[in-house]
Amino acid sequence: MKKSQLIQIARATWLGIVVLMVCLLSSVRAQAPETLVATASVKNASGASLSVPVTASITRFASDAERDALLAAVKKGGTAAARQLLEKGADAGSIELGSRKTAIKYAYARTLGGGDRLLTLVTAQPVFFLGAGAPEAKPKAGYDLGLVLLELKASGPGKGELVPAAKVRVDAQNAIVTEDYGAEMVQLTNVVKK
């Protein structure tokens, strides 16, 4: 072999190693544990409002295959099937709302334009029941999941929504539709990494 061929082979090998390392580091960074803090606020029809701190500690994110499996479960059997699938899986972190802590069973991150991200967090049990005019509102059949949607900004605080007790189904356009136990929307503001 000529010296120039050996140099080309060496360069190609080093380039391959560098590309592999970049891919591995990106994968590790995407799976790194993440803690987010926010303020959850709700206002009822009479104008009374309540705000409490929220902490979402995410220890692992779902793969595309796990996402597809969850969507298939919702299509097949709605909330009950989704809950069964989620209960079998390992915890992906926790949501702490005030003094109540609930296991996250599914955490999925999607990159948006400009470096923003959309996170979907799902619990296999309600985070709490908001409504019925009482702080300790009672459960209603079928509202068995908790959902958190977070829009994280590349710079500055993000925002989101918390559906503390929900039913889920798939509509005719294959979109996930949620039905909230309560009439009031829980807004998440000032969402930042801790």
Regions found by a protein language model. Give the residues of each.
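N-terminal secretory signal peptides that target proteins for export/translocation
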Residues: 1-11
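Intrinsically disordered, low-complexity segments
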Residues: 2, 24-25
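A residue-level detector for conformationally permissive "hinge/kink" positions
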Residues: 8, 22, 69-70
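Bacterial N-terminal signal peptides
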Residues: 12-24
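Sec/Tat signal peptide C-region and signal peptidase I cleavage site
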Residues: 26-30
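Long, low-hydrophobicity ectodomains and other hydrophilic envelope-associated domains
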Residues: 32-76, 80-194
